[in-house]
């Protein structure tokens, strides 16, 4: 009996670790009562210059905003509840601009409700969620520049 309990305990621990390992590259940026902001550290790439060079002032990143239940119900999309807004953006660290390359709206089950490409370039507004993400990505890119450079060259 004790052997079965130990096997069950070990199985549960392995399951718990394997389910969190996939999310390990999503770094928390900030949260308020309505939205949590995260970015994918593994997705960071610097912009390319020619074939061999990179521009460390241009950073590509996947990030998302997870919406609270009450907040998401106030802002439906085509009658559906949006739980997550996932974005792929190009950040210009010199000009403090963000270029939306892809925006994906997901429901509570993770299904895509809507998708839009090339949403344009805009300046990052102070005190916005994009500004929080921008600052976190900029700092992460500064600290991990060598790792991101290697990933960007591949």
Residue ranges, per PLM feature:
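Bacterial N-terminal signal peptides that target proteins for export
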Residues: 1-8
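Bacterial N-terminal signal peptides
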Residues: 9-16
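N-terminal secretory-pathway/extracellular module detecting exported/lumenal segments
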Residues: 20-87, 92-154
């Amino acid at each position: 009996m004790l052997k079965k309990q130990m096997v069950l305990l070990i199985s549960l621990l392995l399951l718990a670790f394997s389910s969190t390992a996939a999310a390990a590259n999503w770094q928390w940026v900030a949260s308020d009562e309505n939205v949590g902001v995260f970015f994918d550290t593994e997705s960071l790439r610097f912009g390319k210059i020619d074939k061999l060079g990179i521009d460390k002032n241009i950073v590509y990143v996947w990030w998302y905003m997870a919406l609270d239940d009450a907040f998401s119900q106030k802002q439906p999309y085509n009658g559906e509840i949006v739980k997550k807004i996932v974005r792929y953006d190009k950040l210009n660290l010199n000009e403090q601009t963000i270029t939306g390359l892809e925006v994906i709206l997901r429901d509570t089950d993770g299904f895509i409700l809507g998708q839009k490409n090339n949403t344009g370039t805009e300046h990052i507004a102070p005190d916005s969620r994009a500004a929080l993400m921008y600052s976190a990505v900029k700092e992460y890119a500064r600290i991990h520049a060598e790792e991101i450079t290697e990933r960007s060259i591949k």
